[in-house]
């Protein structure tokens, strides 16, 4: 069987609908027995010797002509894993759900006729840039320079915890160059709120408490410290510029969501976050890492992979807090996916 390429679509004649769509989920019917398939679908049929050519072209020529090599790598991999999938093209099945996607992948055992989508997949090369605002409810299929595939699931994920907050009032605090010190009445802050760190070390049972500027600003706003919030924020801006305001907005939002954020420095992130907390003496592992980014941030796939790999390696989720100048936050969770 020879296909015909016209206006970016390959037309297959004869009994193509019965052979390729009705039984195996390729293309879209056009009436009768004929079938329209996308170039990547035609390339897959060529690779299986299910059709003889497209306008006399074999697989090599078709991929070069249509520029679908990366799409073919992903399409074939998902087919090999047992999925039926459709290209996200106008007029193809499920296209209403296909914004920012290249393929719609159906649950195993289902196809385009069932109306159920398992994954919305976008194909990305290793060196392409990825606007963070374009992510969420889509799976990234990243093809590296060797042709290997890595899948990342991206979805909105508002933080939520069970940590109760019980703050003291008007504790004396001393504002330093990059932190604050609280000398008296610190047990309630530290033991029951996990604010700060003991100046004498994490294993100390007593002594003054050192607070990050983020913690100090948050506590000053809540009148737990007898210092001016504006002074703390000004000091924070001196230390890290406007980024301090974004990080403070995220810190406050995490606390308001009944989670406990702490420094994520050791994990290369802004925060590590505990969703369950009762006391420092009964501390569990943190559940996810947070990196604060601007809404117009652009990822390089290699950096995204590094963040997600590191989080997964320590059994945590990677969450990005897209934070604008007004402190509005959209949350994005990214994790490795094996389809």
Swiss-Prot record:
Mind listing the GO biological process terms from this record?
Answer: tRNA splicing, via endonucleolytic cleavage and ligation
State what this protein does. Answer: Endonuclease that removes tRNA introns. Cleaves pre-tRNA at the 5'- and 3'-splice sites to release the intron. The products are an intron and two tRNA half-molecules bearing 2',3' cyclic phosphate and 5'-OH termini. Recognizes a pseudosymmetric substrate in which 2 bulged loops of 3 bases are separated by a stem of 4 bp.
Q: Which reaction does it catalyse?
A: pretRNA = a 3'-half-tRNA molecule with a 5'-OH end + a 5'-half-tRNA molecule with a 2',3'-cyclic phosphate end + an intron with a 2',3'-cyclic phosphate and a 5'-hydroxyl terminus
Cofactor info, note text = Divalent cations; Ca(2+) better than Mg(2+).
Q: Which organism is it from?
A: Haloferax volcanii (strain ATCC 29605 / DSM 3757 / JCM 8879 / NBRC 14742 / NCIMB 2012 / VKM B-1768 / DS2)
What family is reported? Answer: Belongs to the tRNA-intron endonuclease family. Archaeal long subfamily.
Please convey what the UniProt record notes about how activity depends on pH: Optimum pH is 6.5-8.5.
Output this protein's name.
tRNA-splicing endonuclease
Q: Which HAMAP family did the record assign?
A: EndA_long
